[in-house]
């Protein structure tokens, strides 16, 4: 199989990531931070090492400003529900993922916030906005948004900035602390190359979020209230130590290879864009230059349903995703709300041969032949 669905989750994982999971489960399976014996301490060390590796990748000074969770959706819910106070005005992008849109819709429906959704949220920014929730790159067109510019605007208007880095962490350089980003959420299982069931959230020093959940943390056990210290305040319950071990190794892999990964992604994205644009009746969405996007390209073939095209590609041994990609307002803005689009997304292991195989298959589908 040719795997081109990396915007959903990355595959394959580096060998170092696979070994980290096996080693943790086979030899270091204790509960981190819950006991004083050597195996528990070793498990806690794995979590700390992963936190430090991710802090290095994000250029964050204090690793304790990074908290772990179940996935990016979990982290976005913590950020939004923890930061939004009664009466706040929240602005987000029409290209945001449902992991942002649905929590905000719930908060707005409950009367807790006022919500504005804009195709160009930076043009809508003003002193009435209390929180801006912005994707670093959207998961449909792959277009990269100007987060640094957004941070400047947010500082100007004394507005909180939440960045959804689901499609960029591990591929693009991230400097949330330096840029002035207040909150930055990411999954561990996409370009960070870790296991599914992992996510992380950077929380700016001094910003106090209301915890999303309460429970055991292994510290301050005499208290019936959540501890104030980070990261324990936001990490109730037993952590996914094997998953966090994989995330740590994935972050280290990205520390070593990120510029190379991005460079190859640019070349392959240019190849994919040029090839698709050369096929009659193929419509490509988003920026037509690779520099302005990550390695995610959505397209349609004539009037064919996106699901049919994806099924034919699957029959040809090529994994892509069709439909609305959990971003219905993005498709509405693109004019593809009825049929969605076919999305091919590159990863660190993608090759020119993979791209060429996809292009040949799409060309066959366009000609009406069996793929």
Regions found by a protein language model. Give the residues of each.
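Pyridoxal 5′-phosphate
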Residues: 1-371
């Amino acid at each position: 199989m040719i795997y081109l669905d990396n915007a959903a989750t990355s595959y394959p994982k580096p060998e170092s990531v696979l070994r980290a999971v096996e080693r943790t489960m086979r030899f270091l399976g204790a509960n981190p931070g819950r006991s004083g014996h050597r195996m528990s301490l070793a498990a806690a060390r794995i979590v700390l090492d992963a936190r430090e590796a991710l802090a290095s990748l994000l250029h964050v000074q204090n690793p304790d400003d990074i908290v772990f969770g179940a996935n990016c959706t979990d982290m976005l819910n913590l950020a939004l529900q923890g930061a939004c106070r009664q009466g706040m005005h929240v602005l987000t992008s029409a290209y945001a993922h449902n992991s942002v849109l649905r929590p905000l819709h719930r908060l707005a429906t409950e009367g807790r916030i006022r919500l504005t959704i804009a195709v160009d949220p930076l043009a809508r920014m003003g002193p009435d906005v209390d929180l801006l929730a912005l994707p670093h790159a959207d998961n449909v067109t792959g277009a990269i948004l100007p987060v640094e510019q957004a941070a400047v605007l947010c500082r100007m208007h004394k507005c909180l900035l939440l960045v959804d880095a689901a499609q960029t962490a591990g591929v693009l350089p991230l400097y949330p602390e330096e840029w002035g980003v207040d909150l930055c959420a990411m999954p561990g299982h996409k370009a960070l190359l870790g296991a599914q069931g992992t996510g992380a959230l950077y929380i700016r020093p001094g910003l106090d979020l209301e915890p999303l959940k309460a429970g055991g943390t292994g510290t301050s056990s005499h208290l019936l209230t959540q501890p104030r210290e980070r990261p324990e305040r936001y990490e109730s319950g037993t952590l996914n130590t094997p998953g966090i071990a994989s995330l740590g190794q994935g972050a280290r892999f990205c520390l070593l290879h990120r510029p190379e990964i991005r460079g190859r992604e640019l070349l392959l994205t240019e190849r994919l864009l040029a090839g698709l644009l050369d096929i009659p009746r193929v419509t490509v969405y988003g920026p037509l230059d690779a520099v302005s996007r990550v390695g995610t390209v959505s397209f349609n073939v004539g009037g064919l349903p996106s699901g049919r095209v994806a099924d034919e590609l699957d029959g040809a041994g090529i994994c892509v995703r069709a439909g609305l990609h959990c971003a219905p307002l993005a498709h509405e803005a693109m004019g593809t709300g009825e049929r969605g689009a076919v999305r091919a997304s590159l990863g660190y292991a993608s090759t020119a041969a993979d791209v060429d195989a996809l292009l040949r298959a799409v060309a066959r589908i366009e000609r009406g032949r069996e793929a």
